[in-house]
UniProtKB/Swiss-Prot annotation:
E.C. designation(s): 1.1.1.267
Binding site for 1-deoxy-D-xylulose 5-phosphate: K128, S154, E155, S184, H207, S220, N225, K226, E229
Keyword set includes Magnesium: no
Stated role: Catalyzes the NADPH-dependent rearrangement and reduction of 1-deoxy-D-xylulose-5-phosphate (DXP) to 2-C-methyl-D-erythritol 4-phosphate (MEP).
Binding residues for NADPH: T13, G14, S15, I16, N127, E129, G213
Protein name: 1-deoxy-D-xylulose 5-phosphate reductoisomerase
Family: Belongs to the DXR family.
Pathway: Isoprenoid biosynthesis; isopentenyl diphosphate biosynthesis via DXP pathway; isopentenyl diphosphate from 1-deoxy-D-xylulose 5-phosphate: step 1/6
Binding site for Mn(2+): D153, E155, E229
Catalytic reaction annotation: 2-C-methyl-D-erythritol 4-phosphate + NADP(+) = 1-deoxy-D-xylulose 5-phosphate + NADPH + H(+)
Cofactor(s) needed by this chain: Mg(2+); Mn(2+)
GO MF annotations in UniProt: 1-deoxy-D-xylulose-5-phosphate reductoisomerase activity; manganese ion binding; NADPH binding
Length: 394
């Protein structure tokens, strides 16, 4: 590995991608941007290429590639433009890359994230859907390739920091009783249940504590985000669903906790800023400045905790059930949720319909065994088709 680490940022124009580039720019002596990818914000992607001068940039189609390549040449930049999933996999597994930030949202991030894992890279995992969809296959690839997998979700990063280094021996073996996964409760934590039928995409995207993209903001409002994180935590830390308890913590200061059999509870605290887990994972096992302000406990004053209400947040229940069933159920849950959230953002369904659509899809057929990646994508395809049927009837 060279002194300056070469970083590929998949999903560079999103919230996580931009935060990653902010941290990288603070440490030019340690990190350089090897490749960037973007999907729809091509003007922003061009600006990032000018700022960071990557070797490669990946865009979704030939038309976007032609336009961007022309702009980059006009700016006298040597950056080469690649296209589509093949391009994403190429920059994720490239021989000169040391570390990959996997921050593409949704199922689209699975193949390039797996490409990074199979190439044995240090993978900073922000794409939770990769593990939700293909958990057993994904973790098997990590073990076989020798890749280093570091979680970026603030909750999983917190759990990682609170566990001993040898937690791979098993949670019981290292004395863990349970993992406490914190959740803010989102913008609808106290909204009267009857009003949830009428909330708008703008209200759902107005998170009280975190700055996030639209899809993850809606997932946070429905608490599907926490459900997906529960499934992800099961795979990352080899935990059973019943070992993970979700706790509403409205201040988003404690990012998660680990409860040990001797009565000790370790927690990781910090301001709600994704640059903290990003900097932790980039530098691990060392520490670097992230640009995040120090935590002011006196300004916070108090920390509150409550149990989640599954009547208010049925998506959390559906995710836990999918985790318990296993097989293709988590992939179908994720696909149905992606369709439902997109329909809600387009104002085609109500917020409360998100859980209804997902439950319909999960009840429409029994979960199947998932022994190869093709089975994962088939489950994803079936779930999207079923979700489309539900949409057509409502």
């Amino acid at each position: 590995m060279s002194t300056v680490q070469q970083i590929t940022v998949l999903g560079a124009t999103g919230s996580i991608g931009l935060s990653t580039l902010d941290v990288i720019a603070r440490h030019p002596e340690r990190y350089a941007v090897f490749a960037l990818s973007g999907f729809s914000r091509l003007a922003e992607l061009e600006t990032l290429c000018v700022q960071h001068r990557p070797r490669y940039v990946v865009v979704p189609d030939a038309a976007a590639a032609h336009a961007l390549q022309g702009s980059l040449r006009a700016a006298a930049l040597p950056t080469e433009v690649l296209v589509g999933e093949e391009g994403l996999c190429a920059v994720a597994g490239h021989g000169e890359v040391d570390c990959v930030m996997a921050a593409i949202v949704g199922a689209a991030g699975l193949r390039p994230t797996l490409a990074a894992v199979q190439a044995g890279k240090k993978v900073l995992l922000a794409n939770k859907e990769a593990l939700v969809m293909s958990g057993a296959l994904f973790m098997q690839a990590v073990r076989e390739s020798g890749a280093t997998l570091l979680p970026i979700d603030s909750e999983h990063n917190a759990i990682f920091q609170c566990l001993p280094g040898d937690y791979g021996r098993g949670l019981q073996a290292v004395g863990v009783r349970r993992v406490l996964l914190t959740a803010s409760g989102g913008p609808f934590r106290e909204t009267p249940l009857a009003e949830l039928e009428r909330v708008t995409p703008e209200q759902a995207c107005a998170h009280p504590n975190w700055s996030m993209g639209r899809k993850i903001s809606v997932d946070s409002a429905s608490m599907m985000n926490k459900g997906l994180e529960l499934i992800e935590a099961c795979w990352l830390f080899d935990a059973r669903p019943e070992q993970i308890e979700v706790v509403i913590h409205r201040q988003s200061v404690i990012h998660s906790l680990v409860d040990y059999v001797d009565g000790s509870v370790l927690a990781q605290l910090g301001n709600p800023d994704m640059r903290t887990p990003i900097a932790h994972a980039l530098a691990w096992p060392q520490r670097i400045d992230s640009g995040v302000s120090p935590l002011d406990l006196f300004a916070i004053g108090r920390l509150d905790f409550e149990r989640p209400d599954e009547q208010r947040f049925p998506c959390l229940r559906l995710a836990r059930e999918a985790a318990q069933v296993g097989g293709s159920a988590p992939a179908m849950l994720n696909a149905a949720n992606e369709v439902a959230v997109d329909a809600f953002l387009q104002r085609r369904i109500r917020f409360s319909d998100i859980a209804r659509m997902i439950e319909f899809v999960l009840n429409a057929e029994s979960a199947r065994a998932v022994e190869a990646l093709d089975a994962v994508f088939e489950a994803d395809r079936r779930a999207r088709a079923l979700a489309g049927e539900w949409l057509a009837r409502h």
